[in-house]
Amino acid sequence: MDGVTRRQWMAALAVSPLAGAAAAYTTSSPRAEGSAGCGSPVRLPARERLRLGRLHNVPLTTHEGRRVRFYDDLVKDRKVAINFMYATCTGVCVPTTRHLVEAQKLLGGRVGRDIFFYSITLKPEADTPAVLAEYAARHGIGPGWQFLTGEPADIEKLRRGLGFASADPTEDADTSNHLGIVRLVVEPAARWGHTVALAPPAHIVRSMHFEFDSPTLRAVRTYVEG
């Protein structure tokens, strides 16, 4: 399994999409409420709940040195694949990056056109844009794939918002538990899924086709749809 331990593999599988947590963004959530008169709460559309609850618009810097906002510049109106990594990682990150490079090739010219890849560092203090640029070049990253760094507090907010967190503090403190999963989001349709990056690249691409392209998907996988 590319040198990845069973524990790491199971940890990756454990970071599943937060289907159950979707209920948190119902009328009982302050972020999901508005006023309809007489104190009655109004449930926001799924897309708005996803933006407010998960896709935090924090400032980031790409490996090319460009300053961006996560939601406004990278996610809004797009189909995106997001994972976490760090440049000195020698475990799960190695096969994850390799498999995503192969998946990018299998997707042909779609990456950078209608699908976008984002890899966010878990160690922003060390992973400067220059460090991430060297990492991207070393691994043969193609167009349409950005490596991102930023302030530690903003990275942490994204990590938790995107569902790469554990309720167990000990497990959550283990960086390896947040690697090996790719969050798949179709922002306009409020679709929210994932794939396992340690799976074969062809499986990753099939998962992306399912999440990104299925014409009937909205009825069964839309984020927080009641």
Task: Cite the ranges covered by each PLM segment.
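Short, internal strand/loop/helix patches
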Residues: E134-L179
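Thiol-based oxidoreductase modules, predominantly thioredoxin-like and allied folds used
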Residues: D114-D127, G144-A153
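Short active-site neighborhood of thiol/selenol oxidoreductases, capturing the structured segment around
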Residues: F70-V94, L100
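Thiol-/selenol-based redox modules, centered on thioredoxin-like
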Residues: D172-G226
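Short loop/turn microsegments at loop-to-beta-strand junctions
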Residues: L55-H56, V80, G180
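Conserved helix-turn-beta segment immediately C-terminal to the redox Cys motif
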Residues: T97-Y118
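N-terminal "domain-start" segment that seeds a small globular fold
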Residues: G37-D72, R98-H99
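N-terminal secretory signal peptides and thylakoid transit peptides that target proteins
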Residues: M1-P17
